[in-house]
């Protein structure tokens, strides 16, 4: 009898010990955070994160890096940021198979007027970059309504990222906003930006390096247009397999542009501009220039960066009377194998300074 009791006790104790062994806990289905600190500390504890009316403290990032695979992030209410001169970013998101979206009526407001001084990133106040989508892979950003970024909007360094129906409205910065690029893409693959609406004071799109990138159904107002580059002078100086299509560029300095860095090396290849409509362009309707140095054109092109297999198809519209319809300044032998079809840009001046234009193109 005593032996039986001992066996029962031993079995009971053993079961209790097994039950006490810690096991991996599954993330809760959903969490709602009302502060940046809580979001940072609790971001891996739930599969759906709702960010409700968060006021991000000055000099801090709304840190959503390292999310669990498959996490959904929902911006709800109004997301705002305290004022401080610093580099940023104000928001950073990373992870795999992440969905970033917003609730109905939500907005993300950078209140950039506190930093805007007409100098952008070239001096004056130090201004924070807005949204880092770095290592945000096999993921999506959908429907965000963003207002008043201090300088650049999205910095994209990711693979397989879809950005759909995002609005970036910096129209309040017409006087003092500067360098408010909407989408800067570098060292990325398979990026798809569809249905973007942009009001800003710099490039609507700037692809500095990467491959398999598409921008379609976009509306770009007030900035510097749709750009490849500037390419060159970085660790990654290759842009290839890019399609920019079915988009409008209005009230902007440039329409479509390829710019490469003076005396640098690299490659721009298989780039297509298709079905682009221009109006109210104040500087250049279509421009390719291989003379950029320290952020400005020199007028002297170099040929270290090859610009080949480029398609301009149905790029049409008007520029202002003191603007230039088309300007192509290539290095010797570096612009080759271009396809030029249905290009009709009118209203401005014809350039007399084009050089080394690819066969088939017209300047």
UniProtKB/Swiss-Prot annotation:
Compartment(s) of residence: Secreted
Molecular function GO labels: galacturan 1,4-alpha-galacturonidase activity; polygalacturonase activity
Repeat region (PbH1), residues: 158-187, 188-209, 210-230, 239-260, 268-290, 302-347
PROSITE patterns: POLYGALACTURONASE
Enzyme class: hydrolase
InterPro entries hit by this protein: Glyco_hydro_28, Glycosyl_hydrlase_28, PbH1, Pectin_lyas_fold, Pectin_lyase_fold/virulence
Glycosylation sites (chain numbering): 162, 356
Gene Ontology, cellular component aspect: extracellular region
UniProt key word Kinase: no
Signal peptide: 1-20
Chief location category: secreted
Keywords, sorted A to Z: Cell wall biogenesis/degradation, Disulfide bond, Glycoprotein, Glycosidase, Hydrolase, Repeat, Secreted, Signal, Zymogen
Entry's EC annotation: 3.2.1.15
Active-site residues annotated for this sequence: 202, 224
Propeptide cleavage-removed residue intervals: 21-28
Covalent S-S links between cysteines: 31-46, 204-220, 330-335, 354-363
Lineage: superkingdom: Eukaryota
GO biological process: cell wall organization; pectin catabolic process
Similarity comment text for this entry: Belongs to the glycosyl hydrolase 28 family.
Protein role: Involved in maceration and soft-rotting of plant tissue. Hydrolyzes the 1,4-alpha glycosidic bonds of de-esterified pectate in the smooth region of the plant cell wall.
Record's protein name: Endopolygalacturonase B
Source species taxonomy: Eukaryota, Fungi, Dikarya, Ascomycota, Pezizomycotina
Gene name of the record: pgaB
